[in-house]
A protein has these predicted regions:
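Lipid interaction determinants
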Residues: 18-184
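Sec-dependent bacterial lipoprotein signal peptides
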Residues: 1-20
Length: 184
Protein backbone atom coordinates (compact mmCIF):
# COMPACT_ATOMS: atom_id res chain seq x y z
CA UNK A 1 0.00 0.00 0.00
CA UNK A 2 2.80 2.37 0.93
CA UNK A 3 4.56 1.65 -2.39
CA UNK A 4 1.35 2.39 -4.37
CA UNK A 5 0.99 5.73 -2.59
CA UNK A 6 4.60 6.56 -3.37
CA UNK A 7 4.10 5.73 -7.09
CA UNK A 8 0.90 7.80 -7.22
CA UNK A 9 2.71 10.69 -5.51
CA UNK A 10 5.59 10.53 -8.03
CA UNK A 11 3.13 10.50 -10.96
CA UNK A 12 1.19 13.44 -9.49
CA UNK A 13 4.38 15.48 -9.00
CA UNK A 14 5.52 14.69 -12.56
CA UNK A 15 2.17 15.76 -14.01
CA UNK A 16 2.18 18.90 -11.90
CA UNK A 17 5.69 19.69 -13.11
CA UNK A 18 4.66 19.21 -16.74
CA UNK A 19 1.69 21.53 -16.46
CA UNK A 20 3.69 24.13 -14.53
CA UNK A 21 6.28 24.25 -17.35
CA UNK A 22 3.75 24.82 -20.11
CA UNK A 23 3.69 28.35 -21.46
CA UNK A 24 0.48 30.06 -22.42
CA UNK A 25 -0.21 30.57 -26.11
CA UNK A 26 0.48 34.28 -25.72
CA UNK A 27 3.82 33.64 -23.97
CA UNK A 28 4.84 31.31 -26.81
CA UNK A 29 4.13 34.09 -29.35
CA UNK A 30 6.29 36.71 -27.62
CA UNK A 31 9.34 37.42 -29.78
CA UNK A 32 10.32 38.44 -33.29
CA UNK A 33 8.87 36.53 -36.23
CA UNK A 34 9.73 36.58 -39.96
CA UNK A 35 7.19 35.76 -42.66
CA UNK A 36 6.75 35.67 -46.41
CA UNK A 37 3.29 35.37 -47.88
CA UNK A 38 1.79 35.60 -51.32
CA UNK A 39 -1.88 36.32 -51.74
CA UNK A 40 -4.36 37.44 -54.34
CA UNK A 41 -6.33 40.65 -53.86
CA UNK A 42 -8.93 41.55 -56.49
CA UNK A 43 -7.26 39.10 -58.89
CA UNK A 44 -3.82 40.68 -58.43
CA UNK A 45 -0.75 39.09 -56.83
CA UNK A 46 0.74 40.56 -53.67
CA UNK A 47 3.97 39.20 -52.14
CA UNK A 48 4.78 40.44 -48.64
CA UNK A 49 7.91 39.83 -46.59
CA UNK A 50 8.10 41.20 -43.09
CA UNK A 51 8.99 40.97 -39.44
CA UNK A 52 6.60 41.22 -36.49
CA UNK A 53 7.79 41.74 -32.92
CA UNK A 54 5.29 40.75 -30.22
CA UNK A 55 6.22 42.17 -26.82
CA UNK A 56 5.24 40.73 -23.42
CA UNK A 57 3.29 43.89 -22.56
CA UNK A 58 0.80 43.23 -25.37
CA UNK A 59 2.24 45.71 -27.88
CA UNK A 60 3.72 44.90 -31.27
CA UNK A 61 5.73 46.51 -34.04
CA UNK A 62 5.82 45.42 -37.63
CA UNK A 63 7.87 46.22 -40.74
CA UNK A 64 7.26 44.75 -44.17
CA UNK A 65 7.95 45.17 -47.85
CA UNK A 66 5.48 44.15 -50.51
CA UNK A 67 5.32 43.93 -54.28
CA UNK A 68 1.89 44.35 -55.87
CA UNK A 69 1.66 43.02 -59.44
CA UNK A 70 -1.33 43.90 -61.59
CA UNK A 71 -2.30 44.28 -65.23
CA UNK A 72 -4.05 47.39 -66.55
CA UNK A 73 -4.38 49.59 -69.61
CA UNK A 74 -2.92 53.05 -70.01
CA UNK A 75 -4.24 54.98 -73.01
CA UNK A 76 -5.28 51.70 -74.67
CA UNK A 77 -1.92 49.98 -74.10
CA UNK A 78 -1.78 46.87 -71.90
CA UNK A 79 0.85 47.11 -69.17
CA UNK A 80 1.84 45.13 -66.12
CA UNK A 81 2.65 47.26 -63.09
CA UNK A 82 4.87 46.17 -60.23
CA UNK A 83 4.60 48.46 -57.25
CA UNK A 84 7.00 48.20 -54.29
CA UNK A 85 5.56 49.28 -50.96
CA UNK A 86 7.10 49.48 -47.48
CA UNK A 87 5.01 49.33 -44.31
CA UNK A 88 5.59 50.13 -40.64
CA UNK A 89 3.08 49.69 -37.89
CA UNK A 90 2.55 49.45 -34.15
CA UNK A 91 -0.34 48.41 -32.01
CA UNK A 92 -1.65 46.01 -29.43
CA UNK A 93 -2.06 42.26 -29.63
CA UNK A 94 -3.72 39.58 -27.57
CA UNK A 95 -4.70 35.94 -27.84
CA UNK A 96 -8.28 34.69 -27.43
CA UNK A 97 -8.38 30.89 -27.47
CA UNK A 98 -6.39 30.09 -30.62
CA UNK A 99 -6.85 33.48 -32.29
CA UNK A 100 -4.37 36.34 -32.45
CA UNK A 101 -6.19 39.68 -32.37
CA UNK A 102 -4.23 42.77 -33.42
CA UNK A 103 -5.42 46.34 -32.96
CA UNK A 104 -3.18 48.81 -34.81
CA UNK A 105 -2.47 52.22 -33.29
CA UNK A 106 -0.20 53.62 -36.02
CA UNK A 107 0.70 52.75 -39.59
CA UNK A 108 3.04 54.14 -42.19
CA UNK A 109 3.00 53.32 -45.90
CA UNK A 110 5.39 54.42 -48.60
CA UNK A 111 5.38 53.41 -52.25
CA UNK A 112 9.05 52.77 -53.00
CA UNK A 113 8.89 51.87 -56.70
CA UNK A 114 6.48 51.84 -59.62
CA UNK A 115 7.65 49.96 -62.70
CA UNK A 116 5.85 49.23 -65.95
CA UNK A 117 6.36 46.06 -68.02
CA UNK A 118 5.02 44.61 -71.27
CA UNK A 119 2.70 41.78 -70.13
CA UNK A 120 3.30 39.78 -73.32
CA UNK A 121 7.02 39.22 -72.74
CA UNK A 122 7.85 40.84 -69.37
CA UNK A 123 10.17 43.44 -70.89
CA UNK A 124 10.74 46.66 -68.94
CA UNK A 125 8.94 49.76 -70.26
CA UNK A 126 9.36 52.57 -67.72
CA UNK A 127 9.70 53.54 -64.07
CA UNK A 128 8.35 56.48 -62.09
CA UNK A 129 10.74 58.22 -59.70
CA UNK A 130 10.89 61.33 -57.52
CA UNK A 131 7.86 63.63 -57.49
CA UNK A 132 6.13 61.61 -60.22
CA UNK A 133 6.26 58.53 -58.01
CA UNK A 134 5.04 60.43 -54.94
CA UNK A 135 2.19 62.18 -56.76
CA UNK A 136 1.02 59.04 -58.57
CA UNK A 137 1.11 56.82 -55.51
CA UNK A 138 -0.02 59.07 -52.65
CA UNK A 139 -3.73 58.20 -52.94
CA UNK A 140 -2.89 54.48 -53.09
CA UNK A 141 -0.63 54.79 -50.02
CA UNK A 142 -3.36 56.64 -48.09
CA UNK A 143 -5.89 53.93 -48.95
CA UNK A 144 -3.49 51.20 -47.83
CA UNK A 145 -2.74 53.03 -44.59
CA UNK A 146 -6.44 53.26 -43.83
CA UNK A 147 -6.78 49.49 -44.30
CA UNK A 148 -3.77 48.81 -42.07
CA UNK A 149 -5.42 50.66 -39.19
CA UNK A 150 -8.25 48.12 -39.00
CA UNK A 151 -8.19 45.39 -36.34
CA UNK A 152 -7.53 41.88 -37.61
CA UNK A 153 -7.74 38.29 -36.42
CA UNK A 154 -5.64 35.25 -37.32
CA UNK A 155 -6.56 31.69 -36.41
CA UNK A 156 -3.55 29.73 -35.07
CA UNK A 157 -3.33 26.42 -36.94
CA UNK A 158 0.09 25.23 -35.70
CA UNK A 159 2.15 26.52 -32.78
CA UNK A 160 5.69 25.29 -32.16
CA UNK A 161 8.64 26.81 -30.32
CA UNK A 162 10.25 28.34 -33.43
CA UNK A 163 7.35 28.42 -35.88
CA UNK A 164 3.65 29.04 -36.07
CA UNK A 165 1.12 28.89 -38.88
CA UNK A 166 -1.89 31.19 -38.89
CA UNK A 167 -4.83 31.71 -41.20
CA UNK A 168 -6.69 34.94 -41.83
CA UNK A 169 -9.98 35.45 -43.62
CA UNK A 170 -10.61 38.56 -45.71
CA UNK A 171 -13.95 40.35 -45.99
CA UNK A 172 -14.85 38.29 -49.10
CA UNK A 173 -14.28 35.01 -47.24
CA UNK A 174 -10.91 34.32 -48.90
CA UNK A 175 -8.40 32.59 -46.64
CA UNK A 176 -4.65 33.25 -46.48
CA UNK A 177 -2.30 30.96 -44.59
CA UNK A 178 1.06 32.25 -43.42
CA UNK A 179 4.04 30.60 -41.72
CA UNK A 180 5.98 32.67 -39.19
CA UNK A 181 9.53 31.65 -38.21
CA UNK A 182 11.09 32.83 -34.96
CA UNK A 183 14.08 35.15 -35.29
CA UNK A 184 14.47 35.72 -31.53
Amino acid sequence: MKQKLHILFVIAVALLGLTACQKSTKDQLVGTWHYVKTMTIDGNTVRIEGTDTNDEDGTYSSVANAVYTFDTEIEGVSVQIKMGVSFKGTGEWTVNDKEIVTTPTSAGVKVTSLKYYDPSDGSFIAELTGNELTETSSAFADELKEGLLEASTEQILVLQENKYVAESTDEDGGKTTCTYNRLK
